[in-house]
Amino acid sequence: DVIEEFIAENEGAVLIEKERLWPHKIKGEGHFVAKIQKLDDEDCRVKEMKLKKLNNEIKEYRNFEKKFLNINLDNRFMLRGDNLYLVPDECPNVEKLKVLRYGLHLGVLKKNRFEPSHALSHYLKPEQIKYVQNIELNDETIFDYLRGNVINTGESRGWVAVAVEGIPIGWGKESNGILKNHYPKGLRINY
C-alpha cells in the first residue's frame, strides 16, 4: 500500500486515519483520503524531485519558444512519453506515485515539431505570446472558434493564441490566411 510505504520511508510520519469514499455510497466520484501527521519531535523530510537535463529531448519545444513566445521558461522540465511538463519549484519526489500531471502541461513533442497544450495558452499572459488573434466580445467569430471551426485571418504566422478581449482562450495554427482550430474537442460547443 502506498500510504504504508510512505510512512515507513518518512520517520516521524504517523497515519491518523484513512477512508475510502465509494462512488455508490456518496454523491460524486469515489476518492481515497488519508490523514498523515508529523510528530512534533521528529524531523520529517520530503525528498525533492531530481530532474535530469533534457536539452536534446526538448529541442523542438525550445524552437517553438523562440518562434512564438516572448519568454524563456526555466529548465524545470519533465518528459513523460511525448508529454512535456513544467515542474513546480520544490516539487516532492513522486516517482513511486501514479501522477496524472506533473505540473503545467506544456504540450506534446511530435516528430520534428512541438504542439502546445491548451493549458499553456491559459498559463501565459498575452504579452508573453508573439502572435495573438484578439476577438471582441460581441464578435460572432468567438462562437466559430468555440465550435471548432476555422477562422479566416488573412495571415500566416504559425501558432497563434486566440484571445477574447485580450485573454487567451486557446491555440490555433495559422497558414495561408486560415487559422486552423486547436481548441480541445471536449470543450467545444455543439449548438
Summary of predicted features, one role per range:
Residues 39-191:
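Polybasic, low-complexity RNA-engagement segments
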Residues 12, 18, 33, 83, ...:
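A residue-level signal for beta-strand positions that form part of recognition/binding surfaces
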Residues 1-16:
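C-terminal substrate-binding/active-site "lid" region of AdoMet-derived donor-dependent transferases
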Residues 2, 19, 28-31, 125, ...:
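Functionally constrained cores in energy, signaling, and assembly domains
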Residues 6, 34, 166:
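Residue-level signal for inorganic ion chemistry
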Residues 21-50:
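Core SAM-dependent methyltransferase catalytic element
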